[in-house]
Amino acid sequence: MSAIVPEIRSADLLRYTVIGSRRPSVYFWAVALTGGGLGFTLAGLSSYLHRNLLPFSDPASLVFIPQGIAMLFYGVLGSLAGLYQWLSLYWNLGGGYNEFDRRTQKITLVRQGFPGKNREVRLEYDFADVQSLRVELREGLNPRRAIYLRVKGRGDIPLTGVGQPPPLTEIENQAAEIARFLNVSLEGI
């Protein structure tokens, strides 16, 4: 699954949806952490109450200190980590869009954050302030494929989301399309 997905393409408007935390891997970890955390919590409580709360094993025979309390501790930690994953999915952290509008000569980057006063992070830049588009390609153990917008006085601003790096051809095509649309140079390819 790509980190940025084209949503609108026209002569005057180019808009890409950026996938935030709603990726398959986050769903997997939310389910795994919640299930594991709940299992460990029930095992720890079973050893404390001397009553079996799990249908597939008999943790009531465990000694509460140290085994039961350790399982309870790890179960609570796992459940909290699972809750965080579910909340990040619900809030769609990091999700948003990149919009390039020729009519207004503006670039709008929008991302979702944590709830509160500044939940929506919105950055706007003029076409005239854009120096170039830069593509970062790094292979190896921790691969990185990203597109950056180089803006005068602001440095490099990432346009791609986090997660699994998209295929090389997809990054190259997206970067070339955005560079043509903005009429700026493309660096790094």
Swiss-Prot record:
The answer on whether this UniProt entry bears the keyword Membrane reads yes
Segments traversing the membrane: 25-45, 62-82
Keywords annotated in UniProt: Membrane, Photosynthesis, Thylakoid, Transmembrane, Transmembrane helix
Among Pfam families, the record links this protein to: Ycf4
Whether GTP-binding counts among this entry's keywords is: no
Its subcellular locations are: Cellular thylakoid membrane
What Gene Ontology terms for biological process does this UniProt record contain? Answer: photosynthesis
GO CC, alphabetical: photosystem I; plasma membrane-derived thylakoid membrane
The annotated topology with respect to the bilayer is: Multi-pass membrane protein
Q: Which InterPro entries match?
A: PSI_Ycf4_assembly (IPR003359)
HAMAP family the record matches: Ycf4
What does this protein do, in the record's words?
Seems to be required for the assembly of the photosystem I complex.
The Swiss-Prot or TrEMBL record describes its family as follows: Belongs to the Ycf4 family.
Its protein name is: Photosystem I assembly protein Ycf4
Species this protein is from: Synechococcus sp. (strain JA-2-3B'a(2-13))
Q: What is the lineage of its organism?
A: Bacteria, Bacillati, Cyanobacteriota, Cyanophyceae, Synechococcales
